[in-house]
Amino acid sequence: MITLDRLNRKEAIRYLGGAGISLNYRMDVLMDECEKEILKTAEPRFLYVERKAPFDDILLGNDIKKHLEGCHTAVMMCATIGSEIDKLIRISQISDMARAVVLDSFASVAVEQVCQKVDEILAEKYSGKYMTFRFSPGYGDYPIEMQKEYLRILDAPRKIGLTTGDSCLLVPSKSCLLYTSDAADEE
């Protein structure tokens, strides 16, 4: 189980387009309130599945082929902070758009921090192996439509409530689906 105790405020400010600026008192208070709301509301969940080579069923596009070239095992992973976050942001969009934007930035930080914690879990599990960077459907020439297949393989709709619609966007929106790393032998 993953828990989030604090969120990276500098990263949230960067998502807001304010990297390197000083916040005024009102914005500082709003940031504090929104961080607390996200931490209280977030329900971090994740799944991963190991896939052994060959990866023919997921190799649509040249970029993913290059990414997994030489790999013996790859890890398909998804993470979410839950649907209540989407509701919280939508409600704020009606009454206080500034708050909604700050909530959205902290929610993005939260799902990224969940992914980083999963990366740490996998790095420990695959100690002594070379781990590549994350690669998601929609990167380069890798079709975003692959998200539906990923969700099916992971059984994510049933296990953690992560789905996609016809547009292939993830629901809840503050979620991530990717080949997080491979476990090729250390070189």
Spans of model-derived segments:
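Active-site helix-to-loop segments that bind/position phosphate- or nucleotide-bearing substrates
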Residues: 1-99
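Catalytic cores of large soluble enzymes that bind and process phosphate-bearing ligands
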Residues: 23-30, 103-106, 110, 114, ...
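General structural feature for long, well-ordered alpha-helical segments within catalytic domains
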Residues: 30, 34-37, 114, 118, ...
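Conserved mixed alpha/beta catalytic, RNA-binding, or beta-rich assembly cores of soluble enzyme
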Residues: 71-134
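Short, structured protein-protein interaction patches enriched in aromatics and acidic/basic residues
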Residues: 130-152
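Acidic, Ser/Thr-rich low-complexity intrinsically disordered segments
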Residues: 149-166, 170
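TRNA-recognition modules of translation machinery and tRNA-sensing kinases, especially anticodon-binding
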Residues: 176
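Single conserved hydrophobic/aromatic residue that forms the stacking wall/gate
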Residues: 179-187
